[in-house]
A protein has these predicted regions:
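Flexible, low-complexity linker and terminal segments
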Residues: 1-8, 17, 130-337, 342-343, ...
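Short acidic, glycine/serine/threonine-rich loops at helix termini
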Residues: 34-37, 60, 81-85, 107-114, ...
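Short beta-strand segments
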Residues: 72-73, 98-102, 155-159, 232-233, ...
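Short helix-loop-beta junction
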Residues: 37-43, 241-251, 466-472
Length: 575
């Protein structure tokens, strides 16, 4: 039977069919759905870990114990997981270990555009790169096999388009893969210097063996057509190139690290001109040039963003197809917090107070955009807490006018240790944890503070208050961000305090089931004075018509925040 599947769903299917029994992940676009789809299979144990480092360590432990395992994350998540991943490359595996890492060319939902192949090369971990959903399924199964055959973790590198595009996938029955017996082996699994030195030699030999395997594998196919143009491509870039220059000769790389030297040389010898088409970093291009081959790549193709069929066609053939354009372009719709978003109240107060805000990764990062513009920085998960300490060290005056904000899931991910750092080093800083009872931006995933597992089972719920108190924070308070006056007083008081403090801004995400508001809200035209204070909260339901604010009832969910900022009391709940 065949089924239309997202690339991410096909990966989950491949895990099921290949006998991968354990998956530990942290949600991150565009990788999130892999673990969510995998959780639907009864034969797979799937969990959300507090962060990617923990997820990879869980998967490594399961693999060494004898069960095929996987961990899934986005590209910046692999930075977090690098510590165990790099050393797991030395230890190798017992049962198959697959690391699914999704890159984000074009920065659809990320803070940078890094190429996972660079880290994989540094870690000496092989990389498989599918170009469609069928290959997603097939390559996961192959990854598990290669992992055991070559005693190595294997990275499955995705891109946003492969992860979120659909194509037909043939469904197969799952393999019966029993757990392998565990044998105590300190020389392999205890990476003290003496053992690690021996394992490093093993890793270098493993790469040579895999390079030899890459010379004849079916996932690196050669297609000779018109010999004037030869294209070496991988991943989604292969699909674009194939559509742009269908008559060209192709070397499609399914294994993008380590690369096959002889296969590439032989292909280049058969064509007049070689183009290397790869999104982001020129990894394959640099390898070809290292071999002394004359290839064309980033000198005509971009180092940045996503590719397209049109871009490649223009670059290689110099042909620019006529593209339909409208006489009038639709206005750009910027990303914005949802109607009823609990973070809106917190941002409104912080903007009003004029404090410096070190921000973090999540829905609340949108507070950096107009009209709020309350966030000053956004670097990575948990950085807000470390940076508020850094601000205070640079100038103690910042302690009186700077706060860190981060979400509940982000705090669990990477916010606890920097808060400990503030306490340990006698710092002064105010941390605001925006607790909306869910991991919001990646699509409502559970986390350790929600009380539910990935599969919806009730579990231990971590109390943010008790956690902060347990590490030594004496000033911990919970506030409702829609109580604007109370929230403002709390921020003023805690920022002025000469010691570390935590404000937990607690109100559930407006999109959660069970969250109810009083009802639709409207503006009384007779009372409205046109001050536009309600526009300052940035609610998409409030628009200007003829210079006066109007509430769009199709978008308004009745949260009532606009009522709280309206001084003339012109906004009220409809009868």
């Amino acid at each position: 039977m065949k089924k239309m599947m997202l690339g991410n769903e096909a990966i989950a299917r491949g895990m099921y069919e290949s006998g991968i029994h354990i998956i530990s992940s942290y949600p991150g676009t565009p990788s999130t759905e892999i673990t969510e789809f995998a959780a639907k299979y009864d034969d797979i144990y799937a969990e959300w870990a507090p962060n990617e480092k923990v997820a990879v360590e869980v998967a490594v432990g399961a693999s060494i114990a004898g069960a095929r395992a996987a961990a899934c994350m986005k590209h910046v998540g692999f930075n977090v997981a690098a510590d165990p991943a790099f050393t797991a490359s030395y230890t190798g595996v017992n049962a198959g270990l697959v690391l699914c890492v999704a890159d984000d060319p074009g920065l659809h939902s990320s803070q940078n555009e890094q190429d996972t192949r660079r880290l994989a090369i540094a870690a000496k971990i092989p990389v498989l790169e599918p170009s469609d959903s069928t290959e997603c399924r097939d390559f996961v199964k192959l990854a598990a096999i290669l992992s055991e055959q070559f005693d190595t973790p294997v990275i499955l590198r995705l891109s946003t388009r492969v992860a979120h595009s659909q194509s037909l996938v043939e469904l197969c029955e799952p393999e019966n893969v029993p757990n392998k017996p565990y044998e105590k082996n300190p020389g392999k699994y205890v990476m003290m210097p003496g053992m690690a030195k021996v394992r490093h030699s093993f890793v270098e030999k493993r790469l040579k063996d895999m390079s030899a395997w890459a010379e004849s594998t079916a996932i690196n196919p050669v297609e000779i057509n018109d010999k004037k143009i030869g294209i070496i491509a991988s991943g989604i870039a292969y699909q674009y190139a194939k559509e742009a220059v269908p008559n060209a000769s192709f070397l499609k790389l399914g294994l993008t690290y380590p690369l096959p030297e002889k296969l590439i040389r032989d292909f280049a010898a058969q064509v007049e001109k070689v183009y290397v088409v790869e999104e982001l970093e020129p990894v394959t291009e640099e390898f070809c040039k290292m071999l002394g081959l004359s290839v064309i790549g980033k000198d005509i193709l971009s180092l940045e963003g996503e590719y397209s069929t049109e871009m490649i066609k223009k670059a290689i053939l110099g042909v620019e197809d006529a593209v339909f354009t409208q006489d009038e372009q639709l206005p750009v719709r910027p990303p914005i917090m949802c109607p009823g978003c609990p973070h809106r109240g917190a941002h409104y107060v912080l903007k009003k107070l004029g404090v410096t805000v070190t921000g973090d990764i999540g829905c609340y990062t949108l507070g950096a955009l107009p009209p709020m513009q309350s966030i000053d920085t956004c670097i990575c998960m948990g950085a807000s807490v470390s940076m508020v300490h850094g601000f205070g060290l640079a100038d103690p005056e910042f302690n009186k006018k700077t706060v860190a904000i981060l979400g509940d899931s982000t705090f669990i991910h990477s916010g606890i240790t920097p808060l400990i750092n503030i306490l340990y080093n006698k710092g002064v800083g105010t941390v605001i944890i925006l607790d909306n009872s869910i991991t919001g931006m990646t699509g409502h995933q559970q986390n350790p503070t929600t009380g539910y597992t990935l599969k919806g089972d009730a579990t231990n719920m971590i109390s943010l208050e008790k956690l902060c108190e347990a590490i030594g924070v004496k000033r911990v308070r919970v506030e409702d961000p829609f109580d604007l006056d109370g929230f403002e007083k709390a921020v003023k008081k805690e920022v002025a305090a000469p010691e570390p403090s935590v404000i937990i801004s607690r109100r559930p995400c407006a999109l959660l089931k069970g969250v109810k508001f009083p009802g639709p809200i409207s503006i009384n035209k007779d009372k409205c004075v046109g001050c536009k204070m309600c526009m300052r909260i940035g609610c998409p339901a409030i628009v200007l018509k003829n210079g006066r604010p109007v509430i769009d009832s199709t978008l308004c969910n009745g949260c009532g925040l606009c009522k709280r900022v309206c001084k003339p009391n012109a906004i009220g709940t409809e009868e």
